[in-house]
Amino acid sequence: KTVCEKGPAAGSAFSFPHTVYNAAGGYLSIFTGLKGFCATIANGTQAGLQSVICACDELRSGAVDAVLAAGTDENSENITEVYSHLPLPGHVVGEGCVTMLLEDAAAAQARGARIYAEILGYAGTHQAARYGAEPAQEQVDRTLAEALQDAGLTAVDRLFTAQEMKARTGDARAASAALALAEACRAVSSGECRTAAALATGWTGSVSCVIVGWKEA
């Protein structure tokens, strides 16, 4: 804003680090002393879930024993204004931040940590399409199947959670995916009705799925 009003000479190079996507990861490292692998994923509504997948890949490789995986979304007046004009009936833009410590099971047990859940498997797919295009139902079905296969599970007694953009086509796709598992799933839920949908950019045609096994408290 200062540069726009007063020109380039009024800008400061020290302001730049606050404007880039990977600033949050840098601050975490500075304030906590964390070192090692660090990545920033900017992929709209898939970013938080894909950060979990990325962290799991690092854990599976054996390169690390623990990883912080985070997803954050902060709204602005501009974002709220833009999405208020999109054809998304009933859609409410949400914001917030979640950070999870993902750790190798053996390492967590060795330090006596309380284990809330176990990530059993995951998968993601992508299709080349124009900007704003909805992924085909085939991609959704494939993602679910691959995630279950990676986890070594079937849909029996699984809880299926659907997250979509509240666009009619998106809701229809989520419903279709749920119906595909309806005979086997114990329950189907969608959290957006309570939390609204947090997002950073538009749709990218990506679909992600993480199979989580919750531990008894």
Residue ranges and their predicted role:
Residues 2-53, 88-92, 162-180:
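Conserved catalytic cysteine-centered active-site region
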Residues 34, 44-48, 56-57, 64, ...:
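Short acidic/polar capping segments at secondary-structure boundaries
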Residues 81-153, 195, 203-217:
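Condensing-enzyme catalytic core mediating Claisen C-C bond formation in acyl metabolism
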Residues 62-63, 112:
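Glycine-centered short loops/turns at secondary-structure junctions
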Residues 19, 24, 31-32, 70-73, ...:
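Fold-independent oxyanion-binding glycine-rich loops
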Residues 63-85, 89, 124-135, 161-194, ...:
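Acyl-CoA/ACP chain-elongation machinery
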Residues 25-29, 49-56, 60, 98-106, ...:
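Predominant activation on well-ordered alpha-helical scaffold segments within soluble catalytic domains
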